C-alpha cells in the first residue's frame, strides 16, 4: 500500500498540489476527472519532476453527469465523459478509474427503480468493457445517503458488479461513507475482499485520519488481510466553520472571489462551502500522512 491523495478538494495548479504532497510523503495522486484541465504530456512531466505517479482518476459527478438520467442523450454523454477518463487514466499509467454512477447531491429519483438500475448497469458495463481494452480497472464508489439515494452500500455495489458482469469491475471503499451506511464497516470491507480496487482516506467526520474516531490500525490490518496493495487516497473535506468560532470562515476558507469554474465551485460548495486555504489544506494533508504512513511502512 502507498499514500495517495485526491486533487479535487483544492483547485490549484497541479504542480502546487504535487510539490506539497510529495514533501509530505505522498507518492501518487487520484486525479480529478476533468480532461480539459489536465493535459497528458504536461501532467506526465510534472509527475516525473516530483517522483510521483497517477494511481487513479475519479469521476467528478456534477451538472448533467448521471448514468441514471431519464434522458438517453444525457446518459450517453455521461458514458462518453467516463470513457474520456479511461483514456486519461491509460495515458497517465493509472490503474483505476473511480466511478460514482449518479450526480452527487441528486437525492430524488426521476424514474422507476427498475429503469434506473437498468440504465446504471448498462452504463457501467459499457464503461468497464471500454476500460478493459485499455487495461484499466473501474472501481464503483458507494456514497452516503446524504449525497445520493441510489448506490449507498457494499451490497448494492457487489450486485451492480454481478449484473454488469465485467471482470475489471470492483469497489472504491471510502470509510467516511461506509461508516454511515454499514452496520459493521470492517465486516463490509472484508466482504469486498479482492474486489477492493481503491481506498479513500477520510474520518467519520470527514476530517483527516487521526482527527476522528475510526480505528486506523485495525482498518489497515484488515486491508492487509484481504490482500489490498493499492493506493490509500486522502479525501478529507471538513465543513467550513462560518460562525465567529471560525472567524466566519476566514480560518479555513480563501477570500472571495475564487478563480474557479462554475461547475467545480458548485461541487466544492456542496461539499464544504468553498475553497480551502492553502495553510489549512496543508495541515489536513500532513495530519493524514502522520497517521497513515507509520501503519504502512
Regions found by a protein language model. Name each.
Residues 8-14, 30-42, 66-67, 105-108, ...:
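Acidic-and-aromatic substrate-binding clefts and catalytic sites of carbohydrate-active enzymes
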Residues 41-50, 70-77, 94-103, 136-145, ...:
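Noncatalytic linker/hinge segments flanking ATPase motor cores
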Amino acid at each position: 500500500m502507498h499514500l495517495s491523495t485526491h486533487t479535487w478538494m483544492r483547485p490549484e495548479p497541479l504542480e502546487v498540489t504535487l510539490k506539497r504532497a510529495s514533501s509530505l510523503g505522498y507518492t501518487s495522486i487520484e486525479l480529478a476527472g476533468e480532461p480539459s484541465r489536465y493535459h497528458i504530456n504536461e501532467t506526465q512531466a510534472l509527475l516525473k519532476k516530483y517522483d510521483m505517479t497517477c494511481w487513479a482518476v475519479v469521476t467528478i459527478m456534477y451538472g448533467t453527469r448521471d448514468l441514471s438520467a431519464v434522458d438517453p442523450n444525457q446518459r450517453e454523454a455521461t458514458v462518453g465523459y467516463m470513457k474520456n477518463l479511461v483514456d486519461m487514466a491509460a495515458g497517465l499509467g493509472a490503474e483505476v478509474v473511480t466511478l460514482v454512477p449518479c450526480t452527487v447531491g441528486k437525492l430524488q429519483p426521476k424514474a422507476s427503480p427498475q429503469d434506473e438500475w437498468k440504465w446504471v448497469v448498462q452504463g457501467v458495463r459499457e464503461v468497464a468493457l471500454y476500460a478493459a481494452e485499455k487495461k484499466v480497472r473501474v472501481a464503483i464508489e458507494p456514497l452516503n445517503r446524504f449525497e445520493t439515494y441510489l448506490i449507498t452500500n457494499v451490497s448494492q455495489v457487489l450486485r451492480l458488479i454481478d449484473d454488469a458482469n465485467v471482470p475489471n469491475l470492483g469497489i472504491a471503499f471510502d470509510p467516511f461513507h461506509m461508516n454511515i451506511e454499514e452496520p459493521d464497516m470492517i465486516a463490509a470491507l472484508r466482504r469486498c475482499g479482492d474486489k477492493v480496487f481503491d481506498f479513500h482516506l477520510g474520518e467519520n467526520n470527514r476530517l483527516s485520519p487521526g482527527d476522528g474516531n475510526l480505528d486506523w490500525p485495525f482498518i489497515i490490518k484488515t486491508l492487509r488481510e484481504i490482500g489490498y496493495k493499492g493506493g490509500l487516497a486522502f479525501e478529507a473535506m471538513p465543513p467550513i466553520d462560518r460562525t465567529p468560532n471560525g472567524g466566519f470562515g476566514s480560518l479555513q476558507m480563501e477570500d472571495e472571489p475564487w478563480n474557479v469554474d462554475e461547475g467545480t465551485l458548485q461541487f466544492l460548495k456542496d461539499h464544504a462551502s468553498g475553497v480551502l486555504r492553502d495553510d489549512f489544506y496543508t495541515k489536513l494533508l500532513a495530519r493524514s500522512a502522520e497517521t497513515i504512513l507509520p501503519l504502512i511502512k
